[in-house]
């Protein structure tokens, strides 16, 4: 039984290309047409470059003459740039109390606006203590006021709901 070659990630290069004919693109980007793989390899070696399989699924496979080390470096660079540009959406939490003062409310609103500008979701938690549980309507009205204040910059993802001793609402940026 013959040992199975380990699967290599990335394109096949030079002698790894075992197909009879390939569609060749030279180092200048010119289409050279369908050539035997042997001839394509010779052209690549004459240029001092590598024969790299760009599109293995087409018929015949498309190969290009280029510097493989440089090709790998550019692909890694593109991948790292794409990773940098990805933004992970976080859920930030703003904690309130039913008897919040206007200035404190304004400070919380500023923080919330900053979170929305950064593209994050906001979980607003309104905590009730002691006898405040008897006046849940005050908390509900506060969350409704907050919802109205952010309607133009955020949308409600989860309406206000009571969980134990706290009322929770989740907002997402528009």
Curated annotation (Swiss-Prot):
SUPFAM superfamilies: Translation initiation factor IF3, C-terminal domain, Translation initiation factor IF3, N-terminal domain. InterPro entries: T_IF-3_C_sf, T_IF-3_N_sf, Translation_initiation_fac3_CS, Translation_initiation_fac_3, Translation_initiation_fac_3_C, Translation_initiation_fac_3_N. GO terms for cellular component: cytosol; membrane. PROSITE patterns: IF3. Keywords: Cytoplasm, Initiation factor, Protein biosynthesis. GO terms for molecular function: ribosome binding; translation initiation factor activity. Its main location: cytoplasm. The keyword Cytoplasm applies. One of its GO terms (biological process) is ribosome disassembly. It is found in: Cytoplasm. Monomer. Belongs to the IF-3 family. PANTHER family: TRANSLATION INITIATION FACTOR IF-3, TRANSLATION INITIATION FACTOR IF-3, MITOCHONDRIAL. IF-3 binds to the 30S ribosomal subunit and shifts the equilibrium between 70S ribosomes and their 50S and 30S subunits in favor of the free subunits, thus enhancing the availability of 30S subunits on which protein synthesis initiation begins. This is Translation initiation factor IF-3.
């Amino acid at each position: 039984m013959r040992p199975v070659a380990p699967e290599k990630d990335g394109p096949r290069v030079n002698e790894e290309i075992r197909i009879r004919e390939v569609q060749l693109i030279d180092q200048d980007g010119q289409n050279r047409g369908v050539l035997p793989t042997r001839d394509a390899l010779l052209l690549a070696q004459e240029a001092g470059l590598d024969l790299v399989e760009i599109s293995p699924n087409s018929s015949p496979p498309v190969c290009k003459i280029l510097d493989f080390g440089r090709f790998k470096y550019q692909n890694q660079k593109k991948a790292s740039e794409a990773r940098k540009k990805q933004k992970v959406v976080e859920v930030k939490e703003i904690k309130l109390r039913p008897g919040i003062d206007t200035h404190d409310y304004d400070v919380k609103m500023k923080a919330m606006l900053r979170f929305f500008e950064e593209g994050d979701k906001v979980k607003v938690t309104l905590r009730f203590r002691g006898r405040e549980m008897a006046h849940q309507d005050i908390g509900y009205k506060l969350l409704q006021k907050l919802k109205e204040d952010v309607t133009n910059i955020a949308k409600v993802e989860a309406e206000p709901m009571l969980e134990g001793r706290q009322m929770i609402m989740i907002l997402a940026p528009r």
